[in-house]
C-alpha cells in the first residue's frame, strides 16, 4: 500500500506494509 503524508509543506511518500502506524 502506498501512502503519501504531507507535513509542514513537505510531502513524504512511501510504501508500507499491511500494518499502518
UniProtKB/Swiss-Prot annotation:
Its cofactor is [2Fe-2S] cluster. Binds 2 [2Fe-2S] clusters per subunit. One of its GO terms (molecular function) is oxidoreductase activity. It is an enzyme of class 1 (oxidoreductase). Coiled coil: none annotated. Keywords: 2Fe-2S, Iron, Iron-sulfur, Metal-binding, Oxidoreductase. The keyword Ribonucleoprotein does not apply. Its EC number is 1.2.99.-. Active with aldehydes and formate esters as substrates. Heterotetramer composed of an alpha, a beta and two gamma chains. This is DYE-linked aldehyde dehydrogenase, gamma chain.
Amino acid at each position: 500500500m502506498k501512502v503519501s503524508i504531507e507535513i509542514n509543506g513537505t510531502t513524504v511518500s512511501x510504501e508500507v506494509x499491511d500494518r499502518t502506524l
